[in-house]
């Protein structure tokens, strides 16, 4: 029986999710269609309701609707609750369920490059993207997890929810780290946060949650210019999609060849 899935967001034309999920479907021999839905700021909640009334099996949610999707759901996973946002929806026993697979997607992609246990990790930015990855990063048992933000107040809001983290402003960064994660939106506008020289002198591994299929993101290029190994978030996109696919279809697809295919576009 043909299963129906979609991703909703605004904008949505650029989304790679249909390509990724169709490749998962071919690999696992599951018949499905996966569409793009342009979100309507006024009618978003009705769009979600209509999708499932029309026998939709699962829905991915992207910017700017993750918080609204979270608020709609009656039942949420623990990681979804801690993230305060949802990117994966499905119906079960006539109730809307929500998950957030971004964090586990990041962890799985990072595992290709380094072990997180006992590492010093710096997250740049204290917005929704940062909040969504803190819990899974803490589960990996790093030595230290620091969130840096332009304004300290916003970072302190995260610290109240996650007391295990330390917070600082960009201006006060002085120490070295094993891993730096850019969770700001600066790369989307081609800008970077210029870090103090001593922060990059230890040559940390650098990861940008943003991605660009055609070229390096601004943060990745900045880190490489500083002599650091750096990658963007395309692998995270594929891994979070795999987790959503597993939630809906109870089959975990493999991701390596799909990631290689997307990189070679």
Swiss-Prot record:
CDD domains: NAD_bind_Shikimate_DH
Sequence intervals crossing the membrane: none
Binding site for NADP(+): 125-129, 149-154, 209, 233
E.C. numbers: 1.1.1.25
GO terms under cellular component: cytosol
One matching Pfam family: Shikimate_dh_N
Record-level Gene Ontology MF annotations: NADP binding; shikimate 3-dehydrogenase (NADP+) activity
Family of the protein in this entry: Belongs to the shikimate dehydrogenase family.
Protein name: Shikimate dehydrogenase (NADP(+))
Organism expressing this protein natively: Legionella pneumophila subsp. pneumophila (strain Philadelphia 1 / ATCC 33152 / DSM 7513)
Organism ancestry: Bacteria, Pseudomonadati, Pseudomonadota, Gammaproteobacteria, Legionellales
Gene: aroE
């Amino acid at each position: 029986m043909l299963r129906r899935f979609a991703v909703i967001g605004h904008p949505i034309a650029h989304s790679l999710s249909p390509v990724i999920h169709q490749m998962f479907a071919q690999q696992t021999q599951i018949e499905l269609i996966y569409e793009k839905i342009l979100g309507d700021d006024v009618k978003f909640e009705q769009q979600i309701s209509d999708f499932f009334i029309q026998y939709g099996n699962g829905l991915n949610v992207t910017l700017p609707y993750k918080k609204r999707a979270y608020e709609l759901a009656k039942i949420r996973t623990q990681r979804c609750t801690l993230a305060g946002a949802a990117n994966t929806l499905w119906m079960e026993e006539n109730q809307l369920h929500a998950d957030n697979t971004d964090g586990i997607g990041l962890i799985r992609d990072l595992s290709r490059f380094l072990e997180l246990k006992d590492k010093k990790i710096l997250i740049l930015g204290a917005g929704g993207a940062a909040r969504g990855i803190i819990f899974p990063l803490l589960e990996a048992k790093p030595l230290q997890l620091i969130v840096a933000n332009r304004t300290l107040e916003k970072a302190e809001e995260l610290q109240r929810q996650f007391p295990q983290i330390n917070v600082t402003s960009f201006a006060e960064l002085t120490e070295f780290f094993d891993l730096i994660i850019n969770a700001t939106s600066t790369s989307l506008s081609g800008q970077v946060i210029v870090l103090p020289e001593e922060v990059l002198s230890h040559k940390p591994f650098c990861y940008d949650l943003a991605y660009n299929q055609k070229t390096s993101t601004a943060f990745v290029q900045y880190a490489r210019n500083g002599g650091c190994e750096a990658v963007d978030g395309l692998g995270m996109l594929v891994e979070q999609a795999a987790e959503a696919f597993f939630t809906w279809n109870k089959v975990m697809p493999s991701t390596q060849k799909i990631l290689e295919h997307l990189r070679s576009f």
